[in-house]
Amino acid sequence: MASSNTVLMRLVASAYSIAQKAGMIVRRVIAEGDLGIVEKTCATDLQTKADRLAQMSICSSLARKFPKLTIIGEEDLPSEEVDQELIEDSQWEEILKQPCPSQYSAIKEEDLVVWVDPLDGTKEYTEGLLDNVTVLIGIAYEGKAIAGVINQPYYNYEAGPDAVLGRTIWGVLGLGAFGFQLKEVPAGKHIITTTRSHSNKLVTDCVAAMNPDAVLRVGGAGNKIIQLIEGKASAYVFASPGCKKWDTCAPEVILHAVGGKLTDIHGNVLQYHKDVKHMNSAGVLATLRNYDYYASRVPESIKNALVP
């Protein structure tokens, strides 16, 4: 392990603070009462004022501190001057105390690609299903997701008025994942988490092929991976295009750092080069344990229907 004064660990420490700031913005927009909803491509593909402000905050804060990064965000925004109030320039000191895995110690700023989803679970956000919402900042090197930060702005929001709202989970491959308590679904139980708002026949047929004991239909890719690492679900199964690289980059790191696995429906690892296509065209299959069991149950007809 190398000193934490490396580009990667400084970037992760910054991303942690920046994700917290974005989470505050997400909460503030709800509190102010005007979500500013616009449809991007259809009624289930929405953008709100929180998406726009959070992305401005994240991308501008990262670009100021790390000007040579490649930053790819979900929302297309005009290159307007960003209000100073949206900029976060602090770093989470606890991360800077951690050693950098030696394989990443010499990484340069310009070698890294950051994938940003400023508000994962937008549809659920507009419907008041606030525990589905996450802020995702994923960091990739040579096409591989190697570090990630997930902020849950409304973690604890149903725990009463005195509860502390929000939490931030982070991880680096070779170091671990932090900010949560790792749990597993009881042995022999097959609980599937899948999409709430983007279902179709391929999705439902693939879920059924898993012979599940229960199916959880929730919003947000980040939220589904958190269900895996906290023992609420055994597998995340989404046999459809629809989810993008900014949805999976950060969550994949957290899952991989604790021994899980995330691939497309064919078992291919996802690539995060700056020039890669944004859509995960062949869906997502992710588990904390027993990946091979779930992968073996994906019907050939579904694989044939989904081209990587």
UniProtKB/Swiss-Prot annotation:
Binds 3 Mg(2+) ions per subunit. It catalyses: adenosine 3',5'-bisphosphate + H2O = AMP + phosphate; adenosine 2',5'-bisphosphate + H2O = AMP + phosphate; 3'-phosphoadenylyl sulfate + H2O = adenosine 5'-phosphosulfate + phosphate; 1D-myo-inositol 1,4-bisphosphate + H2O = 1D-myo-inositol 4-phosphate + phosphate. One of its GO terms (cellular component) is mitochondrion. Highly expressed in kidney, liver, pancreas and heart. Detected at lower levels in brain, placenta, lung and skeletal muscle. It holds the Pfam family Inositol_P. The modification N6-succinyllysine is found at residue 244. Mg(2+) 3 binds at residue 74. Phosphatase that converts 3'(2')-phosphoadenosine 5'-phosphate (PAP) to AMP and inositol 1,4-bisphosphate (Ins(1,4)P2) to inositol 4-phosphate. Is also able to hydrolyze adenosine 3'-phosphate 5'-phosphosulfate (PAPS) to adenosine 5'-phosphosulfate (APS). Probably prevents the toxic accumulation of PAP, a compound which inhibits a variety of proteins, including PAPS-utilizing enzymes such as sulfotransferases, and RNA processing enzymes. Could also play a role in inositol recycling and phosphoinositide metabolism. Is not active on 3'-AMP, inositol-1-phosphate and inositol-1,4,5-triphosphate. This is 3'(2'),5'-bisphosphate nucleotidase 1.
